[in-house]
Amino acid sequence: MVVKTYPLGMVGTNNGIAENEGDSGLEPYVGLEFDTAEEARDYYNSYATRTGFKVRTGQLYRSRTDGTVSSRRFVCSKEGFQLNSRTGCPAFIRVQRRDTGKWVLDQIQKEHNHDLGGHIEEAQTTPRPSVQQRAPAPTKLGISVPHRPKMKVVDEADKGRSCPSGVISFKRFKGAEDSDGQTQPKATEPYAGLEFNSANEACQFYQAYAEVVGFRVRIGQLFRSKVDGSITSRRFVCSKEGFQHPSRMGCGAYMRIKRQDSGGWIVDRLNKDHNHDLEPGKKNAGMKKITDDVTGGLDSVDLIELNDLSNHISSTRENTIGKEWYPVLLDYFQSKQAEDMGFFYAIELDSNGSCMSIFWADSRSRFACSQFGDAVVFDTSYRKGDYSVPFATFIGFNHHRQPVLLGGALVADESKEAFSWLFQTWLRAMSGRRPRSMVADQDLPIQQAVAQVFPGTHHRFSAWQIRSKERENLRSFPNEFKYEYEKCLYQSQTTVEFDTMWSSLVNKYGLRDNMWLREIYEKREKWVPAYLRASFFGGIHVDGTFDPFYGTSLNSLTSLREFISRYEQGLEQRREEERKEDFNSYNLQPFLQTKEPVEEQCRRLYTLTIFRIFQSELAQSYNYLGLKTYEEGAISRFLVRKCGNENEKHAVTFSASNLNASCSCQMFEYEGLLCRHILKVFNLLDIRELPSRYILHRWTKNAEFGFVRDVESGVTSQDLKALMIWSLREAASKYIEFGTSSLEKYKLAYEIMREGGKKLCWQR
């Protein structure tokens, strides 16, 4: 079944006559299909008007994979008990989004617990759409749709002068007369058909209307052309739309504008009904300053998010980003988006409408996150010194253990609100994929933001900040204490061993009451190596140190003029280093040091960097002795100790039923690579090939194509297509690079590509 609805103010050519008409008429039923959730709401509004009740937009549900809306409820206005006029009415419909993009009515309750009023006028002034539907038997339907004349924002009283972008004179919107002498509706009252010169004008118009009516505005969803990627429509919504924050309550009020062929914009959908109390005359500063800060306007900007959290703190937040940065960066973002359709950027607004933090990531960074986003560093090295640019980066580590950029940001201020917005935006750009572990500073705002946005992610404190605190708080302590302190941190193999050594240390030097030592001990699971080994931090050194992605190329002396060029140069340099390692891993063959089949197996699969680490562990395993200390059924335990060093020993547990092995050193849990102790036990048990579970795909030569093995993990079809596009583009880039190194390679590459093209054409 398909239901078609027309844009507001338009009438279908069949005027709502059903195809294969049936006696169901306008009665909703399970299986009814719509193109969009808005069409489902308009349809239910029409049914409600005929039946005698009003509709509110109810709860929505989001995908756990990517955060997109997966289903919506539209309820009787008397649902719930929050207001005296409500009676807890159970009537509702629920529509669910299918993989095709259609919305299907899957739940319904028609019974009301109150009297119905017969045919009533809709509370909103939006014209009702005509409806076409397919049903089993013949009946004719017709809905009268009032027509309203179109009206331009620019009034004839201004003698045809166009309204400048981002500037509106509301004196020109007072009930003008059209050529027939009929008074048009006031432009301060939005309606379908209202025209604007730009998206900026529409935004400021709706914001001014919101001030009069008494609500705040957020810039909502946008839609892009499949042809050229340009923005074709935008939604402006009530600030209480959605449920992502306690201040929001799923309000359905919005205005949508659509771009015309002429370049202008027209209101094509509208809902004026709110599900909350309004405050007429309420100042709505949320959007006023956007065109001052971002001169490029809304016609092309991707996402501008008003941070609701700022409503609960001081209305003014300091901003360390110079105002001149916004237009320059926006121009850069738009130029990047023209050449890279996967380029993502977002700008945060505070409660006064001022531009705050900025986030961006290109398609390669977004694709890299799908492969190497399991362990992430939020690098705020700019906080170490007097940096003029508050530039932060999200860093992952690839299959060569090289840092890869997963997104960049300018941080307006160091508040919980700023970091929460930044983490949420990064998560949105990365299709909702949360990291297993994250290295970030220990300041309270960052701790709170990580806990809020990344529940279940192991937050590890930045090593540079721990070192800085140690220098500050331990400088007056004797060298003997510092030596034992370092030994306690880096030589304790288990959490029990660390706790014992720490207790002995503070007692020995009479530091039981030292406030700083007590504080960091209470947070030991976030920075002590023994407490971190059970979590995966692939590529990050055990002491937590790492080299900043941009090194010293971006520093306290970097000016606005130099920032973008240095950013691009640093990014290209890192990616060139990755390409070189890819080439070496595929074309260079490291020497084998043993005759063990596991060494040949791992040489074939791992990248050069990872294989060398494995090869070192395998070689070291010959310096250890293994002794079975316990056996019951399929479970065995081994004590593995180093020859000539009784103190260096570890316990390995092995299950013969599934070849599972675990070691007390927890190297596999932390790095994703088998340790020398397990390799020793495998050698004793004559296991000549590593089980596949111990060769993580992220460390192999083909790691960049890992998503192909993960198609059924809940990734949406849209995200999967984006991943495939990004992956093929990257593969094509490397293919071109290799194929153009000589004329012979070019001929071979061209022939391979042509043959591959033939296979693709015949593939069904």
Curated annotation (Swiss-Prot):
Signal peptide: none annotated. It comes from the Eukaryota. Expressed in hypocotyls, rosette and cauline leaves, inflorescences stems, flowers and siliques. Its main location: nucleus. Residues 375-471 form the MULE domain. GO terms for biological process: regulation of DNA-templated transcription. Residues 119-144 are annotated as: Disordered. InterPro entries: FAR1_DNA_bnd_dom (IPR004330), FHY3/FAR1 (IPR031052), MULE_transposase_dom (IPR018289), Znf_PMZ (IPR006564), Znf_SWIM (IPR007527). Residues 42-118, 204-280 form the FAR1 domain. Keywords: Metal-binding, Nucleus, Repeat, Zinc, Zinc-finger. Residues 123-133 have a biased composition (Polar residues). It is found in: Nucleus. One of its GO terms (molecular function) is zinc ion binding. PROSITE patterns: ZF_SWIM (PS50966). Belongs to the FHY3/FAR1 family. This is Protein FAR1-RELATED SEQUENCE 7. It comes from Arabidopsis thaliana (Mouse-ear cress). The gene is FRS7.
